[in-house]
UniProtKB/Swiss-Prot annotation:
The keyword Disulfide bond applies. GO terms for cellular component: extracellular region. Pertussis toxin contains five different chains, S1-S5. They are organized into 2 functional subunits: A, composed of S1 (which is toxic) and B, containing S2, S3, S5, and two copies of S4 (B binds to the membrane receptors). Dimers of S2-S4 and S3-S4 are held together by S5. This is Pertussis toxin subunit 1. Changing residue 89 to G: Very low amount of final toxin secreted; approximately 50% of wild-type toxin level accumulate in the periplasm despite near wild-type levels of mature size S1 in the periplasm. One of its GO terms (molecular function) is NAD+ poly-ADP-ribosyltransferase activity. The keyword Signal applies. Its main location: secreted. Keywords: Disulfide bond, Glycosyltransferase, NAD, Nucleotidyltransferase, Pharmaceutical, Secreted, Signal, Toxin, Transferase, Virulence, Whooping cough. Its EC number is 2.4.2.-. The region which spans amino acids 42-49 is required for enzymatic activity and contributes to the formation of a potentially important antigenic determinant.
Length: 269
């Protein structure tokens, strides 16, 4: 059963049904983080290369709690103090996120709330030892501080998760190139242009094979249901998406999504 279908069923029958489905259908193969870490990751951003090629990406703050980041508590919708910069090993999913934002601009224009013009960027980044798998870091946190409730769905999450967290900063030297996507709200034409970064330093590096070890959250530890998309978690994905909308978005990417139950910070989507 595709996870997108399971998500739709979850909306109708509740998360307990979803947990039962994943407990039965979870893969028995090696988890995704057992594979070689990616050499290249991607990030959607609205900032132009004139800024990013010069300054890179810098995290909002120094909160290095992985769960705070993945649930959005330390991101822009929360306290804006995350110590991580979100990226994804899936270029396709990053492209779909950009398409989603572009469609929002088009729909806003139709509703009389904008021009329909849109500019977005997909940055191609060389991963190195400062990039950590979100899924493996999450389960490291559960093993260290929780009661291992999340282990039930470890196989299912590992199959679909592709977020990688850069700690503190991504320097300009790690940013290989950018694809600029422009949608003309008047003509409806969409054009893409690629620019290379003159400051990029070519090296043979990969993301860290080990999880990031978080300090424990100071927030209450309670059982909660958290959406783990295959890209950028809550720091790039929209918090207000319904399960139906997120399932449709994921299906467009040809990927899948999972819901993960774990003992973590209380957070309401």
């Amino acid at each position: 059963m595709r996870c997108t279908r399971a998500i739709r069923q979850t909306a109708r029958t509740g998360w307990l049904t979803w947990l039962a489905i994943l407990a039965v259908t979870a893969p028995v193969t090696s988890p995704a983080w057992a594979d070689d870490p990616p050499a290249t990751v991607y990030r959607y951003d609205s900032r132009p290369p004139e800024d990013v090629f010069q300054n890179g990406f810098t995290a909002w703050g120094n909160n290095d709690n992985v769960l705070d980041h993945l649930t959005g508590r330390s991101c822009q919708v929360g306290s804006s103090n995350s110590a991580f910069v979100s990226t994804s090993s899936s270029r396709r999913y990053t492209e779909v996120y950009l398409e989603h934002r572009m469609q929002e601009a088009v729909e806003a224009e139709r509703a009389g709330r904008g021009t329909g013009h849109f500019i977005g960027y997909i940055y191609e980044v060389r991963a190195d030892n400062n990039f950590y798998g979100a899924a493996s870091s999450y389960f490291e946190y559960v093993d260290t501080y929780g009661d291992n409730a999340g282990r039930i769905l470890a196989g299912a999450l590992a199959t679909y998760q592709s977020e990688y967290l850069a700690h503190r900063r991504i320097p300009p030297e790690n940013i290989r190139r950018v694809t600029r996507v422009y949608h003309n709200g008047i003509t409806g034409e969409t054009t893409t242009t690629e620019y290379s970064n003159a400051r990029y330093v070519s090296q043979q590096t990969r993301a860290n094979p080990n999880p990031y070890t978080s300090r424990r959250s100071v927030a209450s530890i309670v059982g909660t249901l958290v959406r783990m998309a295959p890209v950028i978690g809550a720091c790039m994905a929209r918090q207000a998406e319904s399960s139906e909308a997120m399932a449709a978005w994921s299906e467009r990417a040809g990927e899948a999504m999972v819901l993960v139950y774990y003992e973590s910070i209380a957070y309401s989507f």
